[in-house]
Regions:
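Hydrophobic (often cysteine-bearing) scaffold residues that line and stabilize catalytic clefts
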Residues: 114-122, 209, 213, 305, ...
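Generic recognition of stable, solvent-exposed alpha-helical segments in well-folded globular domains
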Residues: 120, 148, 152, 171-175, ...
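C-terminal non-catalytic accessory extensions
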Residues: 399-435
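Phosphoinositide system proteins, centered on phosphoinositide phosphatases
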Residues: 384-385, 394, 400-403
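Cysteine-centered catalytic environments shared across enzyme families
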Residues: 1-195
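ATP-dependent adenylate-handling ligase core
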Residues: 171-228, 233-260, 264-276, 290-303
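Short glycine-rich phosphate-binding loop at a beta-alpha junction
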Residues: 139-142, 228-232, 317
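Mid-to-C-terminal catalytic subdomains of enzymes
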Residues: 264-390
Length: 435
């Protein structure tokens, strides 16, 4: 219960990477940065018939002011799961809540101003994290590739003493080892992104319990345990010179695509005492400043004049000694997604043990024939151009199908709620002895 007459303030991070969850029941408000934990603590359950949990969590990509931003989802017995993001929530003794948006308060005049402010903020974060009075001081690690965002973050991180990175090497063209050496990193872990497929720890369940659909990253949890994990998340938006959607409200949605990337790996981060620092999102609520800087006269020498053009990232790296042709030449993806897969196709993207466990759970999961059929019909119709173009690519035909042109809202994979419930059921074992 609220412990003092004045109530309390709930202050979330001022970025998209973390959500605070809350459930009110029997005159109490349960709050946690773990969805599974708050469900266990409050004795609440997900509604297995409800298809939109993952889409509700992903709706943050519409931005803080959109009417499509979902702030709560239904639970069993008339309860609701509340989402608090980028806000200060004033919670009163009667459990009434007054919420206001939390912005960074930053402004950027030019590249030098932006770079220095990022360095200052990273240094302050690192000083706090490594303070000797902490019971467990944090280390620091980054990820690196031959793209734009991850290596430019690593270039900044060197200013605050980061010396450790990991890179995927199964695609030689995206191996960031050479860039890491140039930047002065002394500990470089070279890993294979496909290693997760041999895991027997049911890592996929841990990812699904967070509303995430990509277990590739968390397979390397041993590398970032008890560390700050520096990522280039959303650099593909805020650093892209020609991006058409620059705004200051964290609106990162692209059509109806549900692409949450690393913003929902909280169960894994909590387990490993790790903190994600998505560097491009520091001041990401000043995206218009960053676009103006990217298109400024001073940045023209660092613009390649193409659609894949991120002058801020390029300048950070080239001024650190990385040659132009070594990075940002082609866009690669480091993860996987189940967002458009049928259940059968998921087999090739999961470890054998995890898929068999999920298949067993699916057999016991209740079937809702009519609502399932209606939802699947809508899902495949809205995404029909993607599937038709995929078929054309397999037949070596021209991909000519375009999207609907209508933003109907984000739709999660028809199996998403089942996958989420499976993950939550397994994660409950982690917390059940607490209550």
């Amino acid at each position: 219960k609220i412990p003092n007459p004045g109530g309390v303030n709930l202050i979330t991070p001022n970025h998209l990477q973390e959500t605070v969850f809350a459930i009110e029941t029997d005159g109490k408000l349960y709050v946690s940065n773990s969805m599974t934990f708050v469900l266990v603590a409050s004795g609440s359950k997900l509604i297995k018939k409800y298809k939109a949990y993952v889409a509700d969590m992903g709706s943050i990509l519409y931005g803080l002011k959109s009417d499509k931003l979902v702030k709560q989802s239904p639970l069993c017995n008339g309860r609701t799961l509340q989402y608090f993001r980028c806000c200060i929530a004033e919670i009163y003794r009667d459990l009434q809540i007054k919420e206001k948006t939390r912005y960074s308060g930053l402004e950027f005049s030019d590249f030098s101003d932006y770079k220095q402010k990022l360095i200052d903020i990273l240094e302050a974060i690192n000083n706090n994290a490594t303070d000797k009075t902490r019971k467990m001081p944090y280390g620091m690690i980054g990820t690196i590739s031959r793209g734009y965002d991850a290596p430019s973050v690593c270039a900044l991180a060197r200013y605050v003493g980061c010396s450790e990175v990991f890179t995927f090497v199964d695609n030689a063209d995206d191996d960031g080892t050479e860039i890491a050496n140039i930047l002065g990193y002394t500990t470089i872990h070279r890993v294979n992104s496909k290693e997760y497929k041999s895991n027997e720890r049911l890592l996929e369940a841990e990812a699904f319990a967070s509303g995430e659909t990509d277990p590739v990253f968390i397979n390397f949890e041993d590398l970032y345990r008890n560390k700050l994990l520096l990522l280039g998340e959303r650099g593909d938006s805020v650093y892209e010179r020609l991006h058409s959607n620059a705004n200051n409200d964290f609106d990162f949605h692209v059509g109806n695509q549900l692409s949450q990337a690393s913003q929902t790996i909280f169960e894994n981060m909590l387990k490993n005492n790790s903190i994600v620092i998505a560097v491009p999102l520091i001041g990401g609520d000043r995206w218009t400043d960053l676009k103006r800087i990217s298109n400024s006269e001073d940045m023209k020498p660092f613009s390649i004049g193409e659609h894949y053009d991120r002058p801020i990232s390029r300048r950070l790296l080239e001024e650190a000694g990385v040659k132009r042709e070594m990075f940002g030449q082609r866009k690669y993806g480091g993860g996987i997604s189940y967002s458009l897969d049928t259940f059968g196709r998921m087999r090739s993207k999961m470890s054998v043990k995890s898929f068999e466990a999920l298949k067993g759970y699916r057999k016991m999961f209740p079937k809702f024939l009519w609502s399932d059929l209606c939802y699947k019909t809508k899902f495949y119709w809205v995404n029909r151009s993607i599937y038709l173009n995929y078929i054309c690519s397999k037949l070596h035909l021209k991909q000519a199908f375009k999207g609907t042109g209508n933003d109907v809202g984000m739709l999660a994979n028809p199996n998403a709620t089942m996958m989420l419930c499976w993950g939550v059921e397994l994660m409950k074992e982690r917390y059940k002895d607490k209550y």
